[in-house]
């Protein structure tokens, strides 16, 4: 049956067995920290080492059965432990001669001791190879043990081999080899147990003197020492203790008493308070592994390096265990963060994650080297921060999506009136618009004529003139709100302390700021895209309203074409309209275009650190990225789709410092926000209005818009050339010099012919006028001569001639006949016959109407509606009814007048002499 209280750690062949850590965990030894000790025993084979340990520490190492003969019993190295549980219940020490020097510190707790039973030396089984294993086991024991028991027989004192002189020399050489470089190395207790000692043979002091002088000091003098330890004394490295033990068989009772004294001496006098090798219990197994592997490889065994190696290994192991324990909590919160905003993240991260992880880590890791412990702790924190960063990113992504949507809605809402009101500008027929300059408010136009079209127009112009200012201030507010939310994600860390006695309030604190760049980049890019999108939409609306205004103004050209008599007058009139439109647009809308139009070559704005420059250049991180480029292309680039914007965004990658202008970013990120951000965009815009080059380019741009609208108008005129010719013809043919209708029955055929010829020439003169065969400044740069297509002219001529001939034939008919077409000429008999033949139909219609009871309900319903409206005072419905009655009566009257006109035209003409 296997004894669970002991385990083999090194087998006979010198291989380390890997179950030591499991054995220590099973026996609850791993949680001891430094509160344990290690004792090893060295001595000749079959010298009673295991028997001594079993009696001294209540262990169960295998012992030799002498009845079966002498043989090797302990093979390799074995480990057991003693928790001294019996001593905790034994309150009396009267039977001991030992004064418990360290008992006051361990009144209720006695640190357990790990006991290392080492294979005996001078073994015939190992033969010639024994020295190698003996040296290795001695080296291993000294690296681990607080105390090394050298077991020897009294009757062997004076012998070389039997007295373990060679073993002792090996021990001292190995110890010097291990600790000669370490000035503050722990002293190893060399406990000589003299077996089968009798007081009658020699006092213990004599034996002690003999061992110290003839063995220890002699060997120490013979050792080759390094420069560091050349002048060192044996007492600098060892504590020498000698005890005598009575014969275990002859004087068994005395032997047991000696054992008990030695046990108490170890517990209360010799035993260090903590493990002198400064290796925590949870790292002891790994430390043994490292030491033995280094010895086997015949490498230089450096204890500090081994301790550092162990500290690194154990701290990493503890760190990984902590991460494994806490990762599930973080992962659960991570899953939640994908679906919702994590409230109270700061408190949760500080208390439930960081503080809990640090406490769990330092509970075990604080026992190892401070530098390595703290270094690994920083790695632990870094790993936690990496995992928490994902939750922070999710939180900030929720924040940026909300802020991005809010930015877009607010900017859209601010310009909703401009989007809904698409009427043409009224300033064409009025004085110049006085645009209110915007100061710090996002919209300073609330008191301007809300219900009037003129008031809405001024409000729109004011908003457009301050678009960049509004966007800049709204951007500042949005980013400031983002950082307010971001600060809720920063965590405060109490600087870790290895000392358990340090008060938390006295410990230094530091903040960890998570990375916000990704979320801020997305937000800035979204702001950039939304601003450019809304800017593009508003620019298109502005241009469309200008075009509708130009179109409205060009309607006057239709009337001019009827009366114009020469090409110069026609084109001078058109040029006057163009100049008038250009002046009005420049005076009232230039600031709007500088705000809304991309690609305008400015001086102050493009070279400054402001939103305009960033919007007019290739932006990667939204409004903040600025390249000092100037764009002079005046093509219609007001609208760009998202794909085009994404292409621009992917073209440049820059640092976060170029996200926003430095002044704005500095104010936002300051802890003390006493300073207020003031946008300088409007000041720069006002400076730009004095830029002659900009004025020239703006006027050129306005001219292009006007000429484009003029071309469209001229195309309409070209397509309507036939009707224009006909209208010009009728204006001369049907009316005399004083604009009175001509009485064709009073005009002779020759006069009619002359009037027709003059009217026709006047009508077709418009073709030559529209061909622009003269030079007109400004218009010549955009419109060539003979711009009307020949085919259109020919088709218009054919259509116009046909209609002109019809008009002329009607006039000739009236001139020749002078007849009147009237209902009065219809015979009475016709109406009688119509009534007789249609009588059945009239009756059928009347019967159907009354059978369906339509007339009476309609009449009653109409009366009820009128009465209810009068009673309730609903003037709007009464107004509608009044309008309907008026329209019906008016149409009946017009129909009557039309019949009268036809009757007069068909009267019989008088004879012309």
UniProtKB/Swiss-Prot annotation:
Probable GTP-binding protein involved in generating and maintaining the structure of the tubular endoplasmic reticulum network. Keywords: Endoplasmic reticulum, GTP-binding, Hydrolase, Membrane, Nucleotide-binding, Transmembrane, Transmembrane helix. InterPro entries: G_GB1_RHD3_dom (IPR030386), P-loop_NTPase (IPR027417), RHD3/Sey1 (IPR008803). The keyword Hydrolase applies. HAMAP family: Sey1. This is Protein SEY1 homolog. GO terms for cellular component: endoplasmic reticulum membrane. Its EC number is 3.6.5.-. One of its GO terms (biological process) is endoplasmic reticulum tubular network membrane organization. Residues 33-288 form the GB1/RHD3-type G domain. It is found in: Endoplasmic reticulum membrane. PANTHER family: PROTEIN SEY1 (PTHR45923:SF2). Residues 847-849 are lumenal. It comes from Plasmodium berghei (strain Anka). Its main location: endoplasmic reticulum. It is an enzyme of class 3 (hydrolase). One of its GO terms (molecular function) is GTPase activity. SUPFAM superfamilies: P-loop containing nucleoside triphosphate hydrolases. Pfam families: RHD3_GTPase (PF05879). The keyword Nucleotide-binding applies. The chain crosses the membrane at residues 826-846, 850-870. PROSITE patterns: G_GB1_RHD3. It is a multi-pass membrane protein. Residues 1-825, 871-913 are cytoplasmic. Belongs to the TRAFAC class dynamin-like GTPase superfamily. GB1/RHD3 GTPase family. RHD3 subfamily.
């Amino acid at each position: 049956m296997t004894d669970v209280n002991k385990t083999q750690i090194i087998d006979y062949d010198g291989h380390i067995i890997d179950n030591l850590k499991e054995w220590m965990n099973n026996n609850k030894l791993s949680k001891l920290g430094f509160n344990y000790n290690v004792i090893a025993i060295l001595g000749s084979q079959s010298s009673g080492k295991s028997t001594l340990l079993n009696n001294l520490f209540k262990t169960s190492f295998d012992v030799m059965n002498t009845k079966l003969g002498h043989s090797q019993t302990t093979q390799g190295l074995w480990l057991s432990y003693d928790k001294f549980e019996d001593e905790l219940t034994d309150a009396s020490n009267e039977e001991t001669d030992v004064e418990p020097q360290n008992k006051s510190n361990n009144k209720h707790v006695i640190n357990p001791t790990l006991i290392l039973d080492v294979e005996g030396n001078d073994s015939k089984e190992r033969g010639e190879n024994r020295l190698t294993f003996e040296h290795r086991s001695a080296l291993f024991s000294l690296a681990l043990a607080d105390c090394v028991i050298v077991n020897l027989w009294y009757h062997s004192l004076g012998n070389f081999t039997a007295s373990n002189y060679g073993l002792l020399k090996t021990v001292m050489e190995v110890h010097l080899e291990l600790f000669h470089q370490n000035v503050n190395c722990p002293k190893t207790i060399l406990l000589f147990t003299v077996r089968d000692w009798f007081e009658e043979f020699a006092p213990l002091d004599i034996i002690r003197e003999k061992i110290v002088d003839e063995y220890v000091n002699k060997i120490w003098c013979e050792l080759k020492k390094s420069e560091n330890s050349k002048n060192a004394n044996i007492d600098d490295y060892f504590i020498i203790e000698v005890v005598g033990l009575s014969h275990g068989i002859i004087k068994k009772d005395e032997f047991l008493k000696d054992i008990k004294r030695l046990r108490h001496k170890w517990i209360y006098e010799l035993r260090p308070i903590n493990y002198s090798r400064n290796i925590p219990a949870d790292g002891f197994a790994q430390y043994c592994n490292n030491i033995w592997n280094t010895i086997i490889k015949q490498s230089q065994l450096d204890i500090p390096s081994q301790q550092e190696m162990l500290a690194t290994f154990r701290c990493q192991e503890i760190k990984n265990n902590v991460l494994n324990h806490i990762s599930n909590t973080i992962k659960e919160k991570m899953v939640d963060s994908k679906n919702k905003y994590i409230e109270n993240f700061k408190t949760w991260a500080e208390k439930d994650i960081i503080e809990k992880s640090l406490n769990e880590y330092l509970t075990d890791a604080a026992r190892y080297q401070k530098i390595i412990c703290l270094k690994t702790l920083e790695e632990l924190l870094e790993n936690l921060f990496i995992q928490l960063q994902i939750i922070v990113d999710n939180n900030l992504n929720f924040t940026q999506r909300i802020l991005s949507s809010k930015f877009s809605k607010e900017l859209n809402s601010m310009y909703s009136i401009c989007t809904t009101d698409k009427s043409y500008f009224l300033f064409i027929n009025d004085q110049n618009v006085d645009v209110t300059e915007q100061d710090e408010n996002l919209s300073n136009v609330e008191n301007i004529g809300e219900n009037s079209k003129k008031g809405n127009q001024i409000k729109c112009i004011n908003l457009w003139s301050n678009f960049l200012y509004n966007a800049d201030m709204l951007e500042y507010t949005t980013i400031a709100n983002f950082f307010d939310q971001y600060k809720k994600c920063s965590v405060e860390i109490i600087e870790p302390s290895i000392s358990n006695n340090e008060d938390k309030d006295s410990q230094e604190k530091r903040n960890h700021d998570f990375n916000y760049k990704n979320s801020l980049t997305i937000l800035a890019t979204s702001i950039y895209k939304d601003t450019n999108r809304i800017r593009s939409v508003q620019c298109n609306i502005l241009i469309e309203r200008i075009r509708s205004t130009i179109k409205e103004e060009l309607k006057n050209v239709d009337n001019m074409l009827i009366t114009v008599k020469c090409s110069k007058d026609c084109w001078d009139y058109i040029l006057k309209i163009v100049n008038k439109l250009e002046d009005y647009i420049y005076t009232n809308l230039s600031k709007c275009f500088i705000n809304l139009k991309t690609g305008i070559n400015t001086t102050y704005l493009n070279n400054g650190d402001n939103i305009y420059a960033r919007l007019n250049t290739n932006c990667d991180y939204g409004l903040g990225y600025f390249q000092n480029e100037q764009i002079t292309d005046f093509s219609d680039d007001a609208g760009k789709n998202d794909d085009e914007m994404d292409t621009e965004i992917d073209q440049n990658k820059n640092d976060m410092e170029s996200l926003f202008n430095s002044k704005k970013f500095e104010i936002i990120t300051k802890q003390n926000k006493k300073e207020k951000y003031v946008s300088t965009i409007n000041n720069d815009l006002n400076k730009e209005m004095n830029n002659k080059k900009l004025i020239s380019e703006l006027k050129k741009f306005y001219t292009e818009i006007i000429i484009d609208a003029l071309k469209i108008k001229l195309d309409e005129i070209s397509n309507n050339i036939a009707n224009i010719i006909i209208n010009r013809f009728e204006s001369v043919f049907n009316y005399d010099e004083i604009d009175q209708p001509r009485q064709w029955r009073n005009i002779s055929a020759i006069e009619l012919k002359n009037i027709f010829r003059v009217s026709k020439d006047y009508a077709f003169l418009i073709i030559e006028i529209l061909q622009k065969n003269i030079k007109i400044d400004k218009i010549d740069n955009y419109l060539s001569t003979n711009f009307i297509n020949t085919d259109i002219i020919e088709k218009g001529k054919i259509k116009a001639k046909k209609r002109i001939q019809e008009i002329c034939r009607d006039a000739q008919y009236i001139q020749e006949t002078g007849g009147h077409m009237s209902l009065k000429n219809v015979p009475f008999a016709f109406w009688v016959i119509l009534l007789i033949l249609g009588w059945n139909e009239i009756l059928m219609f009347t019967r159907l109407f009354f059978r369906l009871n339509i007339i009476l309900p309609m009449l009653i319903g109409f009366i009820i509606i009128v009465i209810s409206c009068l009673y309730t005072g609903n003037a709007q419905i009464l107004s509608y009814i009044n309008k309907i009655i008026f329209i019906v009566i008016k149409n009946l009257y017009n129909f009557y007048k039309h019949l009268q006109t036809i009757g007069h035209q068909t009267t019989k003409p008088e004879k012309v002499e």
